[in-house]
C-alpha cells in the first residue's frame, strides 16, 4: 500500500512539474502607452486585427499598472511580477547618491549598469538560464547584461521603431519559432505612446498609429497559420500604462515659484512624479513650502501611501511630488520637455502624459491573449501588471520566481489543465516527495 501511495505521490509531483504547455512557444507584445479604451467594443469595429484576436482569445476589462504609471517601472513589473519597490526600477529617471550615478530613461551609458537592473530577475533571464532561446526586438533592457545573462538575440532599441520595423520584427519572430531558433520572442512597439504624448490620446495621429498596429496584427494571424504554428504558439499582448490629456497652457506647477532650486541637491524627472533630494539642512524648509502648493502632494519617503508599493525602493528620493491628474510639475516653464516637431526645433507642446496615480482610469492598460492554452472569445475581469508574469510562466512551462501577482485573477483565462496549475508548484512537489520519503 505504501509503495502504491508513494508511486501516486511521485506521479503527482512530476505532473505538477510539467504544465500542459511546457514546450509551447510564446510571442509577447509590449505596446507602449496603449490605454484600455482604445479597444473598447465600439473601437474594435474599426480595428479588424484586434477584433479577430479578441474573438479568438482573451480580453481583460483593463490592466492596472504599477505606480508610478511610467514605462521603465512597468516594463520590469510586467516581466518580474514584482512591485517597483521590490524590483527597484522605480522611475524613468533615477539617481543613486552613493555612487552619484543616474538612470536617464535608458539613454545614458550609466543606465546600462547592473546597479539598476539586478534588483530582480526578469522572465527572459530565467528562460535563458534554463537553456531556452529568447529573441527580443527593440525591448528596453535586452541589451543589458542582467545577473550575468543576456538573451539569445537582442535587436537593440535605438530610435522609435517604425511601422515597417514592427512588421519585420513580427515576421522574423515567427520565422524564428518555425525554425526552432526561438522559444520566446518579445516585441516592443512605441509609436502609439509617442503620438499620444505629442498630439493627445484622442488625436487622429494616435488613432492612425493604432490602425497601423492593427494592420500588422491582422497579417500576423495569417502568418501564424501559414507557418503552421497555430497549435504550438501562444500570443500575449499588453501595455505598460495608459495616457491622459495635459494642458501646458494652464496646468503647470513651476517649482521655482515656491522654492530656491539652489536648495536642491538633485531633481529627477518632470511631470506627474518628481523626485527631490534637498541639500543638507534644507529638507524641512522645502517640504513645508511645497506642502502648500495646490494640485500636487509632497510626500516624505515614509509617508508615501502603502498602496503605491513604492516607498521601500532603494532609489526613492527623500521627497516625492505627485501631481493631480492633468497637471505637470517642472522646475520652470523653460524646462518643459518640448519635442522636435516639423520645424526641426524642440518647440512642440506635449498634449498627453502618464505617470499619475495608477488607479486613475486613464492610466489603465490592456491585456489580450490567444493560442492553444487560452480560452476563446472570453472576457476577463480586470487584472494588474504584477499578474501578467504568472500567465507567461504558465504558458511557457517554467517555474515562476516569488512574485506579487495573483493567480486567482488570471487562472480563469486559461484552458483546462493550464488553468488549475498553481503559480508556484515546487512547494507541492516538495510535499509529495517528503511524503514519499516517509513512506519508503
From Swiss-Prot:
InterPro entries: Alkaline_phosphatase_core_sf, Phosphodiest/P_Trfase. This is Glycerophosphocholine cholinephosphodiesterase ENPP6. It comes from Homo sapiens. Gene3D superfamilies: 3.30.1360.180, Alkaline Phosphatase, subunit A. Zn(2+) 1 binds at residues 32, 71, 240-241. The modification Phosphoserine is found at residue 71. The keyword Transcription does not apply. Homodimer; disulfide-linked. Homotetramer. It comes from the Eukaryota. Its EC number is 3.1.4.-, 3.1.4.38. Glycans are attached at residues 100, 118, 341, 404. GO terms for cellular component: extracellular exosome; extracellular region; plasma membrane; side of membrane. Substrate binds at residues 32, 71, 92, 193, 241, 354. It catalyses: sn-glycerol 3-phosphocholine + H2O = phosphocholine + glycerol + H(+); a 1-acyl-sn-glycero-3-phosphocholine + H2O = a 1-acyl-sn-glycerol + phosphocholine + H(+); a 1-O-alkyl-sn-glycero-3-phosphocholine + H2O = a 1-O-alkyl-sn-glycerol + phosphocholine + H(+); 1-dodecanoyl-sn-glycero-3-phosphocholine + H2O = 1-dodecanoyl-sn-glycerol + phosphocholine + H(+). One of its GO terms (biological process) is choline metabolic process. Binds 2 Zn(2+) ions per subunit. Keywords: Cell membrane, Disulfide bond, Glycoprotein, GPI-anchor, Hydrolase, Lipid degradation, Lipid metabolism, Lipoprotein, Membrane, Metal-binding, Phosphoprotein, Signal, Zinc. Predominantly expressed in kidney and brain. In the kidney, expressed specifically in the proximal tubules and thin descending limbs of Henle (at protein level). The active site is at residue 71. Residues 1-22 form the signal peptide.
Amino acid at each position: 500500500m505504501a509503495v502504491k501511495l508513494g508511486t501516486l505521490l511521485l506521479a503527482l509531483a512530476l505532473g505538477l512539474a510539467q504544465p500542459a504547455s511546457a514546450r509551447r512557444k510564446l510571442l509577447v507584445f509590449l505596446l507602449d502607452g496603449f490605454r484600455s479604451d482604445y479597444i473598447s467594443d465600439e473601437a474594435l469595429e474599426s480595428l479588424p486585427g484586434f477584433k479577430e484576436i479578441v474573438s479568438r482569445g482573451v480580453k481583460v476589462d483593463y490592466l492596472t499598472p504599477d505606480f508610478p504609471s511610467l514605462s521603465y517601472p512597468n516594463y520590469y513589473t510586467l516581466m518580474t511580477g514584482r512591485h517597483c519597490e521590490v524590483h527597484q526600477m522605480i522611475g524613468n529617471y533615477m539617481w543613486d547618491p552613493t555612487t552619484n550615478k543616474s538612470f536617464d530613461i535608458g539613454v545614458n551609458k550609466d543606465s546600462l549598469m547592473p546597479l539598476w537592473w539586478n534588483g530582480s530577475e526578469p522572465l527572459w533571464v530565467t528562460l535563458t538560464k534554463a537553456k531556452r532561446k529568447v529573441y527580443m526586438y527593440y525591448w528596453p533592457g535586452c541589451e543589458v547584461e542582467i545577473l550575468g545573462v543576456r538573451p539569445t538575440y537582442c535587436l537593440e532599441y535605438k530610435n522609435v521603431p517604425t511601422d515597417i520595423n514592427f512588421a519585420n520584427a513580427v515576421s522574423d519572430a515567427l520565422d524564428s519559432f518555425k525554425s526552432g531558433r526561438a522559444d520566446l520572442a518579445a516585441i516592443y512597439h512605441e509609436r502609439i505612446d509617442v503620438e499620444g504624448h505629442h498630439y493627445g490620446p484622442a488625436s487622429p495621429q494616435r488613432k492612425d498609429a493604432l490602425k497601423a498596429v492593427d494592420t500588422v496584427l491582422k497579417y500576423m494571424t495569417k502568418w501564424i497559420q501559414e507557418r503552421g504554428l497555430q497549435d504550438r504558439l501562444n500570443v500575449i499582448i499588453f501595455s505598460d500604462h495608459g495616457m491622459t490629456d495635459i494642458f501646458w497652457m494652464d496646468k503647470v506647477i513651476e517649482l521655482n515659484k515656491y522654492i530656491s532650486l539652489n536648495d536642491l541637491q538633485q531633481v529627477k524627472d518632470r511631470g506627474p512624479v518628481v523626485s527631490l533630494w534637498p541639500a543638507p539642512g534644507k529638507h524641512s524648509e522645502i517640504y513645508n513650502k511645497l506642502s502648500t502648493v495646490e494640485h500636487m502632494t509632497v510626500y516624505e519617503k515614509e509617508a508615501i501611501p502603502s498602496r503605491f508599493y513604492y516607498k521601500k525602493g532603494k532609489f526613492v528620493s527623500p521627497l516625492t511630488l505627485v501631481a493631480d491628474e492633468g497637471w505637470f510639475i517642472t522646475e520652470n516653464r523653460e524646462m518643459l520637455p518640448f519635442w522636435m516637431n516639423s520645424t526641426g526645433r524642440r518647440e512642440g507642446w506635449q498634449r498627453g502624459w502618464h505617470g499619475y496615480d495608477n488607479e486613475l482610469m486613464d492610466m489603465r492598460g490592456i491585456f489580450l491573449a490567444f493560442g492553444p492554452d487560452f480560452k476563446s472569445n472570453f472576457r476577463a475581469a480586470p487584472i494588474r501588471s504584477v499578474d501578467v508574469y504568472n500567465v507567461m510562466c504558465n504558458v511557457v512551462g517554467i517555474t515562476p520566481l516569488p512574485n506579487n501577482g495573483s493567480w486567482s485573477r488570471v487562472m480563469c483565462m486559461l484552458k483546462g489543465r493550464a488553468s488549475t496549475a498553481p503559480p508556484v508548484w515546487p512547494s507541492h512537489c516538495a510535499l509529495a516527495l517528503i511524503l514519499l520519503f516517509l513512506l519508503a
